[in-house]
């Protein structure tokens, strides 16, 4: 056994753990900032989607932001007569969280009765209640079209660590 303080340089086991935890928290913050960043849509990439976790007194909500290139639209609801794909949001939470229904803004009628679209930027909210911590993932899917063509269906998954 060696006598001496545990905190000698090179023996700072507690500090190393704190540094690892700090690095993990910093990495989570960078990931959250990247997920929240909005990329400007272009003709070749007409829809960009970003998401961020917004905490509140009951738990929080995922705020999903869609930005659309001028002239394109995405579908909110699709009539059985139309072949399009509507916006989907699939959220996975750990047991103990209570997942609310996604809150969409009003969409405008388009073509066939029963089909509605968004043709400008919009935000969807997904409320989640619970005081627990843990991972939450949210997969967002959509199809965009302009007056000449439709893009293949697309999706993106966002992951958050709730603390």
Protein language model annotation of sequence segments:
Residues 1-163:
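Extracellular/lumen-exposed scaffold segments
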């Amino acid at each position: 056994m060696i006598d001496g303080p545990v905190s000698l340089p090179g023996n700072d086991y507690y500090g190393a753990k704190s540094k690892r935890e700090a690095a993990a928290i910093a990495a989570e913050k960078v990931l959250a900032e990247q997920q929240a960043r909005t990329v400007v849509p272009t003709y070749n990439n007409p829809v960009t989607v970003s998401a961020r976790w917004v905490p509140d007194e009951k738990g929080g909500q995922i705020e999903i932001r869609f930005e659309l290139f001028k002239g394109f639209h995405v579908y909110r609801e699709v009539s059985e007569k139309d072949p399009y794909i509507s916006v989907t949001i699939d959220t996975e939470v750990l047991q103990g969280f209570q997942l609310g229904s996604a809150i969409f803004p009003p969409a405008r009628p388009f073509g066939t009765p029963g089909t509605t679209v968004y043709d400008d930027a919009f935000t969807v909210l997904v409320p989640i209640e619970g005081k627990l911590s843990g991972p939450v993932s949210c997969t967002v899917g959509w199809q965009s079209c302009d007056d000449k063509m439709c893009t293949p269906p697309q999706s993106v998954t966002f992951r958050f660590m709730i603390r």
